[in-house]
Amino acid sequence: MRVFVSSRRVKRWQFFHLFAICFILSFMVFWGPINNYIMSHMKSYSYRYLINSYDFVNDSLSLKHSSVQPHHPYLINHREKCQAQDVLLLLFIKTAPENYERRSAIRKTWGNENYVQSQLNANIKILFALGTPHPLKGKELQKRLIWEDQVYHDIIQQDFTDSFHNLTFKFLLQFGWANTFCPHARFLMTADDDIFIHMPNLIEYLQGLEQVGVRDFWIGHVHRGGPPVRDKSSKYYVPYEMYKWPAYPDYTAGAAYVVSNDVAAKIYEASQTLNSSMYIDDVFMGLCANKVGVVPQDHVFFSGEGKIPYHPCIYEKMITSHGHSQDLQDLWVEATDPKVKDISKGFFGQIYCRLIKIVLLCRLTYRNSYPCRAAFA
């Protein structure tokens, strides 16, 4: 009997020993990248004050007097889009030539100008900004883009290849177009084509800001003290030759952000003086803003690169959510249902929604959507 018990204890210890070894090995394998990630962010954040407060970053990226930004002629344009109109919001949607289905879904939902005019009593202008199809995709796609624009009249296109590494050219397209053809729009917004925008909430928010005449306004999901990615295998790799500093100036996630028209004008002017080889467009925006002294403000209901949890209590105050390439129309119907506002009515409704938001938003896992403090906003 003692031998049997002793044997069980030995097997148990062997199991725990094996488990401990596996745990340690797993920890060693995964801790390296995690530790590097944590340390790089801690290091970059420690430089944040210097990066945001002094001009040495901008000086190192400024164009020489003999240099100019590359010029890309328009292939599709609508210079009359804003003429002689009182425009609350000029909204650019960054899209790829092949993403017709996404553009179509946006036109049927939150990007419908007629809906915003008739139901929300606001005049907004929406344009899809893009470059040219990759040469391997041939001329047929360009022909389809021309046909699409003849139907909807909402595309602007310049003559540069539409690719990830040309996103800053697309940034220059948007702010250049706004500066030339629609400088009087109260606000400028830029968004990805897989974003969801709760247009009723956004319009209500902007109309309130318009009444108080807000200036120096730049809002979105703010990244503070983010480090450049030095891993060559990463999509976001930035070599030292392109950007040598350990941290970026504060910037908003490129998924969606809004600026007032005075900021849009300043950003355009700054963009003409900085080297556009920095192909991460939201970082380039941060560099431009840093040069003219504009500071981003964080809004808890602007999503980062993450998708928000689906629930009516979340929809009540949401403004943007990222990553909706397939479910845009269903989410539009659910989120804009008038019954959503009824859920949080009354004392018990407010308590219920507060608890739901805490459960959905206050998690240890990083979601890059709404922060925990949004549950208490």
Curated annotation (Swiss-Prot):
Glycans are attached at residue 58. GO terms for biological process: central nervous system development; lipid metabolic process; protein O-linked glycosylation. Residues 1-14 are cytoplasmic. It is a single-pass type II membrane protein. Pathway: Protein modification; protein glycosylation. The chain crosses the membrane at residues 15-35. Belongs to the glycosyltransferase 31 family. It catalyses: a beta-D-Gal-(1->4)-beta-D-Glc-(1<->1)-Cer(d18:1(4E)) + UDP-N-acetyl-alpha-D-glucosamine = a beta-D-GlcNAc-(1->3)-beta-D-Gal-(1->4)-beta-D-Glc-(1<->1)-Cer(d18:1(4E)) + UDP + H(+); a neolactoside nLc4Cer(d18:1(4E)) + UDP-N-acetyl-alpha-D-glucosamine = a neolactoside IV(3)-beta-GlcNAc-nLc4Cer(d18:1(4E)) + UDP + H(+). The gene is B3gnt5. Beta-1,3-N-acetylglucosaminyltransferase that plays a key role in the synthesis of lacto- or neolacto-series carbohydrate chains on glycolipids, notably by participating in biosynthesis of HNK-1 and Lewis X carbohydrate structures. Has strong activity toward lactosylceramide (LacCer) and neolactotetraosylceramide (nLc(4)Cer; paragloboside), resulting in the synthesis of Lc(3)Cer and neolactopentaosylceramide (nLc(5)Cer), respectively. Probably plays a central role in regulating neolacto-series glycolipid synthesis during embryonic development. The keyword Magnesium does not apply. The keyword Acetylation does not apply. Residues 36-377 are lumenal. Its EC number is 2.4.1.206. Keywords: Developmental protein, Glycoprotein, Glycosyltransferase, Golgi apparatus, Lipid metabolism, Membrane, Signal-anchor, Transferase, Transmembrane, Transmembrane helix. Its main location: Golgi. It is found in: Golgi apparatus membrane. It comes from the Eukaryota. One of its GO terms (molecular function) is lactosylceramide 1,3-N-acetyl-beta-D-glucosaminyltransferase activity. It holds the Pfam family Galactosyl_T. It is an enzyme of class 2 (transferase). One of its GO terms (cellular component) is Golgi membrane. InterPro entries: Glyco_trans_31. PANTHER family: BETA-1,3-N-ACETYLGLUCOSAMINYLTRANSFERASE (PTHR11214), LACTOSYLCERAMIDE 1,3-N-ACETYL-BETA-D-GLUCOSAMINYLTRANSFERASE (PTHR11214:SF21). This is Lactosylceramide 1,3-N-acetyl-beta-D-glucosaminyltransferase. It comes from Rattus norvegicus (Rat).
